Amino acid sequence: MKVIFMGTPEFAVPALKKLITHHEVKAVFTQQPKAKGRGLNLAKSPIHQLAFEHQIPVYTPSTLRNDVINLINKVNADIIVVIAYGFIVPQAILEAKKYGCLNIHPSDLPRHRGAAPLQRTIIEGDRKSSVCIMRMDTGLDTGDILMKEDFDLEERTTLEELHNKCANLGAELLIKILANIDNIVPIKQSSDGVTYAHKLTKEEGKINWHESAYKIDCKIRGMNPWPGAYFSYNDKIIKILEAEYLNADHHFTSGTVISDKLEIACGSGILRVKKLQQESKKALNIEEFLRGTNILKDTVLK
């Protein structure tokens, strides 16, 4: 099948690799190169790099206006696959090809529609999730489902683990669909259980020690690497990169450091910190961190 691919980050890479192997990718659309690092050198997106390596024509428009729509109409393709592209796709593009536009969404739709389904799945402590392949419409992740696979999450699944699982599973489902697309009956999404996975903000990363240790641990795993779950100490922002929660009763004020190994009393339970990063410094395990930053027992963190 002849395919136009629209995507940008690492999450979209497994699907493009599968499409290159099993189908004919006629064109790739991705975000423009962005300045990165201290030298602010322009860096191509992971999808741009992969397409370039396979000599596939790459386009990096700043908008999806008429000139881009006309270009897409001229590309000889049967279907468009859109994965974390970074632009809202207009109706003219959704309807440009015979089989429309397909999208991989890493959640149990209609739960976690929106920009940050992976992060919200972890933050909210979900123990089950899904990967859905849908035919896109003009709504926000409201399209009909062509294929879905459910799976269980381990209690302390990390964002990286969930990201990789969904990216690879989505790529496999996509190839199955394209092999049998004329025989698949789309299923409308339920109107029940709709939630929205809004984009994360830096402010959301601030830890509220009145919450349970379990909920804070979910936040730490769901917000690593960005924006990071953090607290302030001596006017410095400190991110917690890894921790574990203990279901232990205590009588301390929430936020109290109750041991010299940085165990912190929460609204319920205790958070045992394992890895941290102070702003503008490298990540350290707890032993290394405490050698340079002495957070005393009985300190109450804010």
Swiss-Prot record:
Residue numbers binding (6S)-5,6,7,8-tetrahydrofolate: 107-110
Gene3D superfamilies registered for this protein in UniProt: 3.40.50.12230
Catalytic activity line of the entry: L-methionyl-tRNA(fMet) + (6R)-10-formyltetrahydrofolate = N-formyl-L-methionyl-tRNA(fMet) + (6S)-5,6,7,8-tetrahydrofolate + H(+)
A GO cellular-component term linked to this record: cytosol
Signal peptide region: none
Keyword set, alphabetical order: Protein biosynthesis, Transferase
Record-level Gene Ontology MF annotations: methionyl-tRNA formyltransferase activity
InterPro entries recorded: Fmt, Formyl_trans_C, Formyl_transf_N, Formyl_transf_N_sf, Formyl_transferase-like_C_sf, Met-tRNA-FMT_C, Met-tRNA-FMT_N
EC number: 2.1.2.9
A Pfam family that the UniProt record links to this protein: Formyl_trans_N
EC category: transferase
Function of the molecule: Attaches a formyl group to the free amino group of methionyl-tRNA(fMet). The formyl group appears to play a dual role in the initiator identity of N-formylmethionyl-tRNA by promoting its recognition by IF2 and preventing the misappropriation of this tRNA by the elongation apparatus.
NCBIfam families the record matches: fmt
Family label: Belongs to the Fmt family.
HAMAP family: Formyl_trans (MF_00182)
Protein name in UniProt: Methionyl-tRNA formyltransferase
Provenance organism: Rickettsia massiliae (strain Mtu5)
Lineage: Bacteria, Pseudomonadati, Pseudomonadota, Alphaproteobacteria, Rickettsiales
